[in-house]
Amino acid sequence: MRSKNLLVATAVATALAGATSAYALTPAVTAAIPADHQLVIAGASAARDAVEAGLSAATFCQAGTFNRYRVATTNSPDLRAYSCTLATGSPYFNDTIENDNVVIFYRSEGGSIWGPGAIAKNVPVARLVVNASCTLTDGTNYLCPVSNYNLANDGQTATGNITRTLVNLGVADLEPEMFSGANWVEPGTPLGNEPAAGVLAALPAVPVIGQAFGILVRSDSPVAALSVQDITSIFTGNYGDWSQVPGSGTTGPITICRRERGSGTQTGADVFFNGQNCSPSALPFVHSTDNPPIFGNTVIENSTSSSLGTCMTANTNSIGISVANAAPTGTKFVTIGNQAPGRATAAVGSYDYWFEATMTKAGGLNTTVGLIADGLIAVVQDDTTIPTVNSAFALSGLGPVSAPNAAVLPVSTTRPVALARRGSSEGNSCQKPQAQN
């Protein structure tokens, strides 16, 4: 009898893992969710807020069923997971999967390139594991133990709640082809060498949201405004001292706090200011080793946004790059062309330093996994679910087929829709924003 009861209990638990529930999914239930209801995402940290906002929408996940999982050590490595029961009657996905339990893994460690890059190379990447080792901290938030992670080998020697799997959906701050050349990862990582010419460009990327980026200086710096020409001159090493920058009001050798290769923030700065991957006469971005500044001033490469903020506060006369949300402690954003960075100025067309974030589905996905991915793309595109952070805004023409995003004046102060797009419906970071008819 005991054996029979055990079999019944096991069958019930398995059924619950893939069927209806009206409560937040426990780690045990989440761990039992079958593979065809698991979606593995990798890539941009800047776009992660948009994904989480979409998942939090009651039209995607049923209210009260959403749980969030993170690594116990804050933001390093940045591996996350979300579980919930899919909503009924949702405009975002096929009704064959509504009311099902799903788990979505999001790996943003290393930045954008680890999404489309891993898909292009067909290599597994590190992601979180959800099980009974994850402990509830508050409400719906769990922390899971991971130790000894190293980006250089992407966790191959790490221990704890970590594994390596192929990527189903890549998220990047720009279209995949922008991550070639100087913006492919440093040599020696599991991603290996850059794929053959044309492979990244051929990936089926779709734009999802607009994101504004900005230039940081220290809070105690008198520098408040810079031109595109000034910033390009600094990032190419042609300005090495603030005394060379017209109207800076200060002097001293400039320290450049940049991001690592493969970061969407770094790639965007390289594209916008230096023309990388857009012009045959593109200028190389300063680097600590293979392209040092001609004046010999310091360049510090940072693997995360938080470490870049630390770099800024630790170095007098520093300059850095960031998605245009709240400036890190001890720093401030400058205006570019007398325009402050943010969703409102970007959406209305007065601030050009922004890009269309993209999502790329891997080929050959299981039907159910593909439906979950399609639903996630749709909810992230929707202007009603865009996160209310300063950097993010919706793109016109995207969103639900029944009610696509529409650009109107005056633009919303919380969830604006851009009056213009970069290039065609597939996005083109090399083109200036223009109205879409």
Task: State each model region's role.
Residues 1-8:
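Bacterial N-terminal signal peptides that target proteins for export
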Residues 9-18:
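Bacterial N-terminal signal peptides
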Residues 18-24:
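Sec/Tat signal peptide C-region and signal peptidase I cleavage site
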Residues 24-437:
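Flexible loop/hinge segments at secondary-structure junctions
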